[in-house]
Amino acid sequence: NRVAVSVQNNSYSQRLSFSYLDPYFTENGVSVGYNLSFSNYDQSNNNTANYTSSNTNLEAVFGIPLTENDNILFTIGYDKTDLTTFVGSTPEPLIDYLATVLGPSPRFPCFPSGDDDNNATTPPGNDDNNPTSPDPDICGGNQLWPINQFRAATGWGRDTRNDYVLPTRGTLNRAGVEFSFPGSDIAYYKFSYEFEYYRPLNSWLVFKAGTDLGYGDSYGDTGDAGLPFFKNFYAGGPQSVRGFEANTLGPSYGSCIPLAPATTCIPSYLQPLGGAVKVTGSFELLFPKLIEAPGTRISAFLDWGNVFAGSFDYSKYNNSAFGAVFGDEKFSLDAIRLSAGVALQWQAPIGPISISYAFPLNSKYDFDRVEELQFTFGQQF
């Protein structure tokens, strides 16, 4: 049996998690695990929209081996999420989504009014027009949205790669679906598919191809509101389309500085929204023997992809007095971003390290956020 405790703390998140796994719950290899986590995220520090979330997650995971290479996972869990949005800062479409699906949320913090009646014998909060009643409180621009979700997920995986860390042959397939049960505050579903293919071309060169696809939407009582924005897919950065800043591809919401003619403007303070549709992938040439150091290899790559809004309609916000949505909302081939570059992977004693240098081949907008040199340390999940 395995027991683990994990603590994470960085500029945008704090997370404490506990996990227990019995890998041989039955004689035929069925595993059972339990996970409990508490986390806080400040999305404004993570190249996403400006809101915060406080989360409690509890789940049970069942793993069923089908063959030596195939397995199925079943997950059932409960999520308690408290989102905080900020009037004038959180993108208008996000607040509208929550108000439409959950109903209006009162603002906070609230403060008592000043001593408007100028009467020292009455309490400061007394109404100046009616000393027997208090003044109404003045409330700020924060809004709290409590969300309770009961969810389930199932996934299939097939892995024929010859090495988990630095493979040179074989394939990896992963397909999954996640959904919330009817009766949850928001009814949604998500599909995902991941594919990797490795083939040696000779003793010193390996070809790799991969793709990562995703789609999500709402259903049932949530109607056609769309996938909850806090469940969106993201693209850009070391884990998808290198050469662009992490999470910044796809629709973004920002201020609109007018230009002449009045129908045009300059985007400012862009907040990436992610999307309900994800289409990304890569082609890569791996050089496993170019550097003799163990656990190290160099590659040359071509990345492609983007994320799109899906069923959510951002068009009504494009003439908003508060801001507008910029970028590619709907899927199209000319919206697919391309980048090319080189990368170094090193399985260092202190953890995996990856360094890449890439340049975009078809940056479409002036506000595309380019980041040529990217560095990651540790495994990301």
Please report, for each region that a protein language model flagged, where it lies by residue.
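Secondary-structure transition/capping motifs at alpha-helix termini
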Residues: N1, Y24-V30, L66-D70, F195-L205, ...
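C-terminal outer-membrane beta-barrel translocator/porin domains of Gram-negative envelope proteins
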Residues: S89-E329, F375-Q380
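Short glycine-rich, acidic/polar surface loops and turns
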Residues: E284-L286, R337-Q345
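Gram-negative/organellar outer-membrane beta-barrel architecture
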Residues: N1-L172, R242-G243, N247-G254, D334-A335, ...
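Secondary-structure boundary/capping motif
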Residues: Y193, R337-S339, Y357
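Active-site scaffold segments
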Residues: S299, G341-Q345, S354-S356
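Short amphipathic alpha-helical interaction segments
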Residues: Q271, G275, D328-I336, Q345-Q347, ...
